[in-house]
Amino acid sequence: MIWHVQNENLILDSTRIFMKAFHLLLFDGSFIFPECILIFGLILLLMIDSTSDQKDIPWFYFISSTSLVMSITALLFRWREEPMIIFSGNFQTNNFNEIFQFLILLCSTLCIPLSVEYIECTEMAITEFLLFVLTATLGGMFLCGANDLITIFVAPECFSLCSYLLSGYTKKDVRSNEATMKYLLMGGASSSILVHGFSWLYGSSGGEIELQEIVNGLINTQMYNSPGILIALLFITVGIGFKLSLAPSHQWTPDVYEGSPTPVVAFLSVTSKVAASASATRIFDIPFYFSSNEWHLLLEILAILSMILGNLIAITQTSMKRMLAYSSIGQIGYVIIGIIVGDSNGGYASMITYMLFYISMNLGTFACIVLFGLRTGTDNIRDYAGLYTKDPFLALSLALCLLSLGGLPPLAGFFGKLHLFWCGWQAGLYFLVSIGLLTSVISIYYYLKIIKLLMTGRNQEITPHVRNYRRSPLRSNNSIELSMIVCVIASTIPGISMNPIIAIAQDTLF
């Protein structure tokens, strides 16, 4: 009899949970329509892969790319709608979150065609690769709109788990396995530190988990200037620093970049930074509103360390991917300037604008590396010597992307950095901007060193890799070249395109 009653109670509880979930999805689901499109694409991929004996690879790519493009379209149609807090306060939709979601979708859309030829040549499993990419994209999108501590923790874990699986996708590669283990262990440690910081924030606010309610809770408990908040700030900064590859939490980055498949590195190098930057901006700006001086100081120190260490160590690298790893550490230091400046002096607009340009510059560079690696099998910087004599198109594309990363005019990277540094200067961050300018000059040195190798390699310096290089004709169906051309064009757009981009970015208020 007791068992029968308990069983009935369990059924009733399960029914209530199901009805509540159905109610939330029915009334709030329209606000996450772009995410629902990706979920539908994931289910469709799984169904086709499970039921079909013959793997129609072009069809898998088509479904993935179409899902991403449709999600972007749905996101654009939702632009300028009223901000909404949905799913019982777990998720928020506004222009600020949606522009970061757009950037993540743009990254994934460009990364899929960049991966096609690489996966075919390495004989990697295509379905799982696309599933991990779409799931990571979904996790990044939910992180951008996360409005409570639980979602802010669960969403990046979804992204991180897919990142671990993608970085170790070439199971027979010893370097890939080593990189995955380091990434997994350090990622787990950083997540633990982040959760510990959240627990201090949760306790200090009187048990609140929503970001805005945490602020109200801190006011009610009079704990907004307590040591507990400073401890929470310290732990959360360390956890976010790992996600952003900020020094000194950057040790995993070079090994993961070098050991992972190159298309995976291209994907992780941009999407992780976009999602983590969106989350960091909201975490620091809302719950730590009363500790703005403290987190400004912390981020300034981390930004200076990242810009100096990243660019100085990049000079000594012999691997293209390791060089880009240290370069990305320096680049995220520039992005931090926009987060510190905030919305009052156009900091968020400059950060978003620079991130848009960084996506095109970085993915364009990685597209060139993927193409060169497939044709030569090497990643060493010295092996690029004299590439211009064999493949002028690839050499010029790589040179333009590197010059844009360095911030030379009249390329997009120059105007992005100029606007970012100008906003920092207006906000009074004179020392931070000066360090940024100095390290930008240092970065130009190692980028120009590579370009000199590309263009002026003498016959005796040309390695067998380039000497035996066979340039395939430019084909309309070469997806890597398609991604490369799109990124190169976006990286070389002059300042004439800046005004509309900045105008759109300035609308991204909370």
UniProtKB/Swiss-Prot annotation:
Pfam families documented for this protein: Ndh2_N, Proton_antipo_M
Stated name of the protein: NAD(P)H-quinone oxidoreductase subunit 2 A, chloroplastic
Localization (cell): Plastid, Chloroplast thylakoid membrane
Family: Belongs to the complex I subunit 2 family.
NCBIfam families the UniProt entry points to: NDH_I_N, PRK02504.1
Free-text function comment from the UniProt entry: NDH shuttles electrons from NAD(P)H:plastoquinone, via FMN and iron-sulfur (Fe-S) centers, to quinones in the photosynthetic chain and possibly in a chloroplast respiratory chain. The immediate electron acceptor for the enzyme in this species is believed to be plastoquinone. Couples the redox reaction to proton translocation, and thus conserves the redox energy in a proton gradient.
Gene Ontology terms: cellular component: chloroplast thylakoid membrane
Main location: plastid
Transmembrane annotation, as ranges: 24-44, 57-77, 99-119, 124-144, 149-169, 183-203, 227-247, 295-315, 323-343, 354-374, 395-415, 428-448, 484-504
